[in-house]
């Protein structure tokens, strides 16, 4: 691999997405949110469209840019649509299929052809095991729930319960259980600002670039 990969993993609402986008801008690296692949599969499945067929026919295109990942379907930007809760539920079902998951990992790797900040579950353990540097961004579940509540509103208790349930489900998956890569640098963001997390990540990154 002739390019640098900054792999950032971690549970939901740990702050990994905002940190990853900012690091991408600082470094001038493309940004790849790998979870959007699962969401795109779920989105197309709801329309009875095969994901890999859509990719092959160029109906579905992933644009990896500095600070953002765009998903284009039939010339329309569907990136925002993919962030909706119903799509997330569909994506979770897709992630439970081990035979499909392996094919997805191969596809995700094929999209990265330049220096990149790659963010998402299993990035350090399965997708890019040989990444230049790996981070595992974590935070206390209550803090993660509070962040999502402040961002999206709704019921704090419901959000916390969903996060705890998601954590439990991911850790106990029979195939590809969610875990920290052994060589990943763990950062607990519970009592840290986004700027503090970014600065700490950059300190580590500068040592390996």
Swiss-Prot record:
Major place of residence: cytoplasm
Top-level taxon of the source organism: Bacteria
The keyword Chloroplast is annotated on this UniProt entry: no
EC number(s) per entry: 2.7.4.25
GO biological process, one term: pyrimidine nucleotide metabolic process
Segment forming the signal sequence: none
Residues where ATP binds: 10-18
UniProt-annotated location(s): Cytoplasm
Listed GO MF terms: ATP binding; CMP kinase activity; dCMP kinase activity
Pfam family, one: Cytidylate_kin
Keywords associated with the record: ATP-binding, Cytoplasm, Kinase, Nucleotide-binding, Transferase
Substrates-to-products reaction catalysed: CMP + ATP = CDP + ADP; dCMP + ATP = dCDP + ADP
One Gene Ontology CC term in the entry: cytosol
Family: Belongs to the cytidylate kinase family. Type 1 subfamily.
Protein's name according to its UniProt entry: Cytidylate kinase
Species this chain originates from: Hydrogenobaculum sp. (strain Y04AAS1)
Gene name as annotated: cmk
